[in-house]
Amino acid sequence: MNYAECLELARGKMGNYCKVCPECNGRACKNQMPGPGAKGIGDTAIRNYDKWKDIRVQMDTLVEKRPIDTSLSLFGKNFQYPFFAGPVGAVNMHYGDSLNDVSYNDILVSSCAEFGIAAFTGDGMDSNVMVAATEAIKKAGGLGIPTVKPWNVAMIREKMALVKDAGAFAAAMDIDAAGLPFLKNFNPPAGSKSVEELREIVKAAGVPFIVKGIMTVKGALKAKEAGAAAIVVSNHGGRVLDQCPATAEVLEEIAEAVDGSMKIFVDGGIRSGTDVFKALALGADAVIIARPFVTAVYGGGREGVEAYIQKIGSELADTMAMCGVSSLAEITRDCVRV
């Protein structure tokens, strides 16, 4: 199975919200929520995609021919590629009821672990979303990253107990989910967190903690102050606020400010191995891709996930070879033209 075949099969299994576009660029679903779209007109998701395409790679084949090494070491784990599947919760509501969170997470987490990467998993209003996610990670020997919504600190502590029971090697919180409509009137109050609250959450996790939803240098430095091991430069896939800059536009300045003191992930509109290369050149340590993994699972299950990982991985390796680098460490700023 290749990814194109996977997309064709997914069209018959997904609901009305996701259009299963050949190129997932945010245009067809831009204002649909529930679904993969945004609460506004969706221009941030579209900008995310477009800005990666504005960056060009610097081809250089006057180099010694060497084996290409795409491997990444992160938090004591070794991965075949520097990209991860992104967190998605309540899949039956957003993408169609041929799968639920239990079946989706079982396929995604186990397949990612089998084929050399790891999956971030989602959270939701239904507490069973997080339960299903952490159970899938436990079955995979802890090779997954459970991602909690920014609930109140007491509720997050309860969810961190699930993380510990799963043996997850890291945990995350998508702080930008504060902009999701269903969190606005949640009781007890959920949403944005102070540095002090974040520090308490980081301590409760007991494993390397990743703060997802950082779009400014100021935000990155506050996450560092709170003790985060990593950040994700992210605007929640453009879902939570229109008129934001693209992640590609802010990544480099954030990476320069962090200066290696935390690991940096980036997401938002990354749709090829060449995009992954660009992100690493601008200072990211790794990349997160979400929506295309959903269609991979719906369209092909385990084989679909394998096909998508191989697609992105082979594109990355080819770009590295054509740009004269043989390891991730060699992908530097001069490899791209912005």
Predicted regions and their residues:
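N-terminal functional module of multi-domain proteins
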Residues: T44-M130
